[in-house]
């Protein structure tokens, strides 16, 4: 894969296990700081559904040869500089970092056709600049009833917006018309962000 990557190495990225929404926020922040001209081509993508049971393959936390795991939600970063050059940066995948959109979707989500309806995946796609402004989390979802942490939090302070203390649920929600960005089914997501390099090529006769 040859391209001018926004993030040269995965080791250059802020990462804390089980805080994917914050990891992606940090990627957006890094682009704004180092490559601001590319920010308008970047997105934060939440994956979930009504029951918050979404199977993903090729995940570091997955089991078996296929490395499949069922998350309540997941978040990854996309850079879409050209119609057929969309790249996915997922800090939790076992695929390369980054991976071209088509390969990532094919190996990570496969198809909804073989899944029960309650496991179908939906995608909330949020422009990176919107995500930087509107995302806010006090990390309450990672605390047990006694106040202890389910997983250790990042060492930096919580990411809080000026208007909301905790709005993570609005991003995980897959109801159209609610929350920032746009919500797609798996097929709609592919139709919107995958453009075959052969589409639109005219041949001389």
Curated annotation (Swiss-Prot):
The keyword Nucleotide-binding does not apply. Mediates the side-chain deamidation of N-terminal glutamine residues to glutamate, an important step in N-end rule pathway of protein degradation. Conversion of the resulting N-terminal glutamine to glutamate renders the protein susceptible to arginylation, polyubiquitination and degradation as specified by the N-end rule. Does not act on substrates with internal or C-terminal glutamine and does not act on non-glutamine residues in any position. This is Protein N-terminal glutamine amidohydrolase. It is an enzyme of class 3 (hydrolase). It catalyses: N-terminal L-glutaminyl-[protein] + H2O = N-terminal L-glutamyl-[protein] + NH4(+). It comes from Drosophila virilis. GO terms for molecular function: protein-N-terminal asparagine amidohydrolase activity; protein-N-terminal glutamine amidohydrolase activity. Belongs to the NTAQ1 family. Keywords: Hydrolase. It holds the Pfam family Nt_Gln_amidase. InterPro entries: N_Gln_amidohydro_ab_roll_sf, NTAQ1, Prot_N_Gln_amidohydro_ab_roll. One of its GO terms (cellular component) is nucleus. Its EC number is 3.5.1.122. The active site is at residues 20, 74, 90. Monomer.
